[in-house]
Structures are given as structure tokens and as C-alpha cells.
Amino acid sequence: MAGELYFSGVTGAYDWGSVLDNIMAVKSIPIQKLQQKKQLINQKLQILGEFSQKLSDLKNLIENFNLESALKTKKADVSDSDVISVSVSENAPEISFSVNVLNTASKEILVYDAGFNSLDETIGSDGSFTLRYYTSPTDYVEYTIDYSLIDTLKDIVNKINETQDYVKASIYYDGNKYKLMLAETSEENSTVETAPDLSTKAIHLLGTLPHQFGNNVLIQQAKNARIQIGSGDVIESAGNTFENVIEGVSISAKRAGTSEVSISQDFSKIREFLNNFVKSYNEVVSQVKSLTLGENAPFRGENTIMNVKYGLSDTLTPLMELGLIEYKEDGTISLSGNLESVINEKPDEFKLKMTQFLESAKAVAKVNYEAFEDFKEYLNDQAERIDENIRLLSQRLVQEEQILKRQFAQLEDFMNYANQIRERLKQFMVSISEMNGGNNK
């Protein structure tokens, strides 16, 4: 009956617990074997997880490489990187030229000369003024700044900065007075250049100014950057960056001086791809070798894994024909030859064979990855079936154990009853013997 409890040796007639343990140990051997098999599969799946990541990395590397874009990539070499920096797009022509930086851009900085006696001094009156900022000689933006009699210089600075982003206000201390300082936030915001006498400037304060402001004094002139390419006209920019001065070429001025510029085809993306491919290929091939070769290899003779190596090696023929790849004794590969020379001397052949390699490698990597994922799924299915078998066997074992307990308990009861009968018979025989002995007297 379900739920019944049986205890060994309750009557003392038969201690069947150890016998039951031995029987159950024998009956549980199939479960132990299944558990060992499941453990082995889990170990294989862990190893395959690491290998799968390498296959995925190789597959993504090949699929994400764009040969057309890489062949169009240009680079700019400069003779003096302290003078300029140059960025180029694929539209840039392959030319050389000189750049003369006449001057770099600078921001306009003004200080109002009256000043506050302390940071706690208040303005003492209510009013407002207008901050006007010229973005060009004819165009400007305006902002109204209101102030009250209890405002300090710090309050005015905060109001100016919170109202707009063209001018940065701050406090200038000359050792005696605290003064308002105004500076452009960026050279690129305005093409206005400051005149030494301030007859032309970008920053203006108009209206009723606090008497502590005074007159503005020039600290630094706003200047536009100027460069000359070769013997051409001087080019001017509000900031230090000159966009598309030549199609696809942008120049950033750093300081006055001259630098040579040479624009040429950039092979770095192709070289980087080939280096990464060789590294990834060698990692995959080396792991295939360790997984499938040797007496204790976990996947010895497993075709799914061995085919990964064979499939990838078949894709290398175009690269070997270009002289860019060579085999090493251990089955790995390395780069050989001069990439730049191959591309420059045989551009059409290089593009054709690289395309052939990429197409075949992409197809093989995809097939290998999918086959490998199927193999992992097969092992996972095996593990799930083992789990189900273990569950069923465990249930059956519990039932069999309960049956054996009941049978042993019944046997113990029977043996206890038999012992009791034997004792009674023994006592009965003793009594008869005693009776017979007494009669003989």
C-alpha cells in the first residue's frame, strides 16, 4: 500500500536493511552508467561551446569584411603632425601637396575694466541689458539679461551662461577688483575678427549696464584660421578645420607652419583582415587537431569536427596563388609576400582571387557552423533522453524498493512468528520431559 513505512529489524528476527541496500546498489548500476554518460556528454558540450565560439568569430569575420570598401580606402601621410592633421574619404584623389598654416583660429576674449570690490558686493539697482553676438559681420543673435539690486557679479555670470551657449562668462580677478570676463565658447561660431581698437568685435553688451562693469578691454582677438595649399589662394575658416578643401580631404590646423601631405591607397583594412583571418584559422585548426587526434581525444575520428579543417583549407587556394599564404609544418598558416606589391602590380587578379576566396570561405564557414550547431543539438537531445531514462529508472527503482521492503518486512514477520512457534515447541518439549522424569520416580 502506498505510503506504508517499513523498518528493518523491528522484531529482531531478521535485519534485512543491509541486504536491501546491496540489492538496490546493484539495481542502481544502470542509472550510474547513464549519469556517467550524461557527464561525458556535458563535458563534450562544454568543449564544443568554446569551439563553437571560435567558428562563430571566424564566420562573422569573413561575412563582415567588405572588399570593395577596403580597396577604396585612402590614407593621408603628413610630414609634420604638429602643424596639421588630415582626414580623407574614399573620394580623395591620390596626390601630394604642401599646406602652409598662416595662423590658427582664436576666440575673442573681453574684460570689463571697472570691477567689483568683493564677490559679495551687490549691483545696487535693477535693470537689464542685451547680449548681442555676431555670427558674421551682418548676422547676430540677441539675449536679454535682467538683473536686480541684490545680484552679485557671480549672479550675473550665471544668468549669462544659463541664457545662451555662444558666450562664456566668468570672473576675472586682477589682484584688486573682480571683473566680468566674456569669451567665445567656440571659434567656429563666428567669422567676425576682432579689430585691435574694438571697432569690430563679436561680443556686445547693450543697454543699461551696472556701473561696476565699466568699459570693455581686449584680452584676445578673434581670428579666423588661414591656410594656403601649394601656391593657391589663402583659404579662411572660422575654426581650425577646413572641410573638403579638396574633394574628400579635410584639414585641421594645429599651429603656424608648413607640412607636406601625401594621399594614397590604404591597405591597412585588407592587411588587418588577413591577419585576423590567419589568427582565427589557426585557432580553429589547432583545436580541431587537439579534439580529434590522439588516444584520449574527446572527439577522436568525429567527422563533423574534422570536416571543419578540411573545408577551410580548401578555400585557401586563391590566396596561395597570390603568394599571400603559406602552410607551416603543424598545419597552420602564415602570411607571406608583400601585400602592397601584389595589389599594385596585379590589382585585377588580386580583386578576382580575393573575391573567390571570400565567397568560398563565407559558404564553407556558414555550412560548418550550421553543421556544428546541428551536432551540438544532437548531443543535447542525447542528454535530454538520458535525463528522461534516468527519471523513469529512478521511479521504477523507488517502486521496486518499496516492494522489496514490504516483502522483507513480511519475511521478518514470518521468521519472527516461526521463532515464536519454535520457542513454544521448545518449552512444550521441556515440560513433557519434566513430566516424564517426575513419573519415573
From Swiss-Prot:
GO biological process terms on file: bacterial-type flagellum-dependent cell motility; cell adhesion
Positions in coiled-coil regions: 376-416
Pfam families for the chain: Flagellin_IN, FliD_C, FliD_N
Keyword Coiled coil: yes
Biological function: Required for the morphogenesis and for the elongation of the flagellar filament by facilitating polymerization of the flagellin monomers at the tip of growing filament. Forms a capping structure, which prevents flagellin subunits (transported through the central channel of the flagellum) from leaking out without polymerization at the distal end.
PANTHER family: FLAGELLAR CAP/ASSEMBLY PROTEIN FLID (PTHR30288), FLAGELLAR HOOK-ASSOCIATED PROTEIN 2 (PTHR30288:SF0)
Family: Belongs to the FliD family.
The protein's name: Flagellar hook-associated protein 2
Gene source species: Aquifex aeolicus (strain VF5)
Gene: fliD
